[in-house]
Amino acid sequence: MADFTIKNLRTDVEDAAPQFGMAPDVEARFARDALECENMGLSYQRLAPNARTPFGHKHSQQEEVYVVLEGSGRVKLDDDVRAIGQWDAIRVGRDTMRCLEGGPDGMTFIAFGAPKTPPGDAEIVPGWWS
């Protein structure tokens, strides 16, 4: 029997942004559990125009790749700020602090992370990019 899971990221996965005080400027749908991922994490995220995630974060074990689906913005990686746009893929190694910001039209992106890590892998720093 084939082993697979199909979920719609917009309708089948809850927006967790309100739980973390990020709404209404941020939409964040973490699909790892809904997809029954064994070795990776996946999220769908949307930033309103000129909105920034309210914290920076880094992981002790997990590497992440962000893919911009639409819009544009900027990403801060430690002390380096880069402009990013549609179809850009950004790999961020563990131990690199990161934060994203939507451009004038906002930004929608998917984030992939591996390996799948237990709670506590991320260090969250509120207001890191201010």
Residue ranges, per PLM feature:
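Short acidic-glycine-tyrosine-enriched beta hairpin
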Residues: 79-95
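A generic "binding-loop/recognition-motif" signal
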Residues: 61, 80, 96, 105-106
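Histidine-centered metal-chelating micro-motifs
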Residues: 52-53, 74, 90, 94-99
